[in-house]
Amino acid sequence: MFEGPEVRTLTRQAEQELVGRRITLSSVSPTRPRFLSVSPDPLAFSEQLTGRTIQRITCTGKSLRTHLDTEAILVIGETGGRFQLHAHSDTLPKKIHWQMALDDGRCLTLTIQMWGFLALMTEEELASHPYLGSDGPDPMDPGFSVEMLEEAIRTRQLEKNDPIKAFLIHGPNIAGIGNGYLQDILFRARLSPKRKLADLTDRDVGRLHEAIVETLSGAVQAGGRDTELDLYGEPGSYVPLLDRRQAGAPCPACGEPIQKTQYLGGACYLCPVCQT
């Protein structure tokens, strides 16, 4: 899944490559996976895209937003897979779930792994969307402070005393964090994914803030994780401290074997000694 650092990398590259280009074709595969949501329906989606010019590209959290020369915004969000730019149509991969041709002969393709979201929305529709319009503070922005994190935790704790994993991966709390970067953030903060928000001390929150900033800023500089590809099909250079490749390996801090557990719908990798 693309998380904040991958989306920032794709946004930067797409901004350099696509601004000013006119869309000559959009095609959604009839054999797309059922977990790829397209709005409006695929035919209307492609009809409304064709002929439009790309004006600018931005991102928030885990969604990439292409602003067109109409009021429409093309939103690609909560997506896993490959989003790539090709020199011409002869170089397209065999498996494609959506493609978009440009007036210079190049093509963009999206191939979904797991699930994805494509939508054309106005600013008003985007702002009122129950998920996309409610992202919390972006921890990759320079102004993300420990006070902002404290406020987000305090607000969520009043509504529901979540475990820290549930809090971090919920975009309206903190934008851009998914299960991938969660592992390194919690390891650096020395926190168990099951720790409840109400049990966090001021020192815990301070460590958590440092871990979020260190992990995500490092990943942005590295162009994302080494398991994800950028717009040109190149992997990032951020190597996670903890993922499925480290299960059973010695903890880099204490030597205890890294454990894999299933928690809240996904795998967690942690050191049972360092993370409490």
Report residues per predicted region.
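Gly/Gly-Pro- and Ser/Thr-rich, intrinsically disordered tail segments characteristic of DNA damage-repair
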Residues: 1-121
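Phosphate/anion-contacting hairpin/loop surfaces
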Residues: 73-176, 181-188
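Basic, nucleic-acid-binding surfaces and adjacent catalytic neighborhoods in DNA/RNA-processing proteins
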Residues: 22-44, 152-276
